[in-house]
């Protein structure tokens, strides 16, 4: 049996759920939120769906800009916590966005600055090593 997951600008929470759940598991159940461009989405925490009508201000910003957004919201369930949100694109068309609470905010830069271990260069992108 073949199953296909399709995401569009108008996908609803239930259509986004399989991808959001997979990412949630991949990031060790950190809070994950996902929405389409035109409809509210889903929010997951601790392995559970906690919201199926999630608007997400930072998700909307990433959709509008069409680029990754790192921010610390001042309102909403993640107020005061750093988040990272990536747009979901089909070419130049932004279909939605997915984000995660970024518990790593700043620590990688600190670790790299402290260690400056050259053997790490082959595993990390260029911008991970500010010069």
Swiss-Prot record:
Report any Pfam family annotated for this entry.
DUF2111
Q: Which organism is it from?
A: Methanocaldococcus jannaschii (strain ATCC 43067 / DSM 2661 / JAL-1 / JCM 10045 / NBRC 100440) (Methanococcus jannaschii)
What is the name attached to this protein's record? Uncharacterized protein MJ0405
- Record keywords, A-Z: Cell membrane, Membrane, Transmembrane, Transmembrane helix
Compartments reported by the entry: Cell membrane
| Topological category with respect to the lipid bilayer | Multi-pass membrane protein
Which InterPro entries does the record associate with it? UCP006557
State if Membrane is listed as a keyword. Answer: yes
Source taxonomy lineage? Archaea, Methanobacteriati, Methanobacteriota, Methanomada group, Methanococci
Q: Which positions, given as ranges, span the membrane?
A: 68-88, 94-114
Q: Give a GO cellular-component term.
A: plasma membrane
